[in-house]
Amino acid sequence: MLLAGRQANALSHPVVLDPVGAGASPFRTETTFNLLEDIAFTVIKGNISEMKTIHSGSGTTKGVDADISDAVTEETLEATVAFAKRLADRNEAVIAITGAIDIVADRDKAYIIRNGHPQMAKVSGTGCMLSAVIAAYCGANPEQLLDATAAAVCLMGVSGELAYERMIRNAAGTSSYRSYLIDEISKMSAKKLEGGAKIENR
């Protein structure tokens, strides 16, 4: 990971960090900080518990999912937006905090995104998919990293909603939902994305 990150930096390619499980074990936390120390990341994407670990150096999560006590709610939204901007400033990177409410921020501006469906949590790998899409969008739009990241997050959320609608129509289950999600990502159009995105800026 270190060699790949260094080479990507040398080539001015976007580098996305998804610190899965940071705060859940000493090894994962130490690895996250080693990467942050050695590599300049374009985007840091994770759940709120992982982001709090990056900020403080330790966390309370017990696995790869966010600790329920950290969940972003309407009551904590403004404070979390301010936190995301501070973290972006400190790390010189776009911050994408994912969850029921997504926040994408740089030091000056934040987007709040309310797309997605709870069914997405029943499929392993959706976070990894999102990291890959963010990297692709940032690679295609290197001068608009914040907007590119927000668009990628919207894409995943809208696709999750459309996949769920298709699952219900077909009386299908979780395995089909995974395939439908990939289908919707691959079939997404600009018109469909713009029409479905539930996004505001702060």
Language-model features, listed with the residues they occupy:
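Glycine/small-residue-rich loop that forms an oxyanion/phosphate-binding "nest" at active or ligand-binding sites
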Residues: 3-46
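Short, small-residue-enriched loops and turns at beta-alpha junctions
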Residues: 21-25, 103, 120
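Conserved phosphate/ATP/ADP-binding segment of small-molecule kinases
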Residues: 30-110
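Glycine/charged-rich beta-loop-alpha catalytic/anionic-binding loops adjacent to active sites
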Residues: 107-120
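Short glycine/threonine-rich catalytic loop with a Thr-x-Gly-x-Asp
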Residues: 117-132, 145-146
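Conserved post-catalytic alpha-helical subdomain immediately downstream of the catalytic base
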Residues: 133-176
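Charged C-terminal helix
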Residues: 158-202
